[in-house]
Amino acid sequence: MNHNEIITHALNQLMKSVLKLEKTTNIPQELDAVEGRRFLLRMLSASVDSFVEYIDADRPQFRHSEGPHRKMFGDCPDADYLQATIDLRNGRSYRVRGTIPQGTNYVGVMLYGRGGRIGVCITDEQLEIGNDGLFEILISANPEDNPTLLGNGDEHMVMVRQYFTDRNKQPPMELEVEFLGDVPEPKPLNSAWLAKRIELSRRMLESIFMRTLDAYRRISNFPKNTFVDVPVDLLFPTPDNTYKICWYELETHQMIIVSGILPKA
């Protein structure tokens, strides 16, 4: 295949996956079916972002992975999810610097490995934070570097979570990430590279849907109107949280009242 045909083939395979996955959203309830298709479009966008756009591990930048217009899995509307691409192979290392405002509820920094594997994590309670809120984290897979977060070598992403109770009063943290090494010149775009990244986007899209459908099947078997604990390995969570889910059905003119007791800090 020539350079145009390589890209066309990759795009065709991606579109075939989209059409195949679209059939899984053929749900009897109209609203659920519409939401399923919107979720498909959002995950397509997220997959392309992850493997075509925001992929420079030599010049990483933090970006919001979720927001008002892209909901993924069980993300919390009262949290910011900031992610940056990294590559810990061949002794590479990174420095994360930031400022945590006073009164911040929670900050967690986590590495993710191949296939979404949950890596090491550190929270604001474990960080060395200055009086001005400044902190610094060293990320490496080399124990001799004495890193703050020691990876296995397959990590491709660092994610920072910040939780809020009142966004109007609690400012977002300042954050930056830097590759600690000689930054090479950017490589020119070529068809083989782009075709490979499109294929990786396709695989991510299918993986997201398979994991989401698996989670749906598991959760839908839970007893109705009863909160149950969800395994922390389900849908890229943080191990610092406990996740409880209640499966419910509402008839016309019904409502749900959720009550509980908050634990003392």
Regions found by a protein language model. Name each.
Residues 1-265:
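A compositional/structural signature for long, glycine/proline-rich flexible linkers
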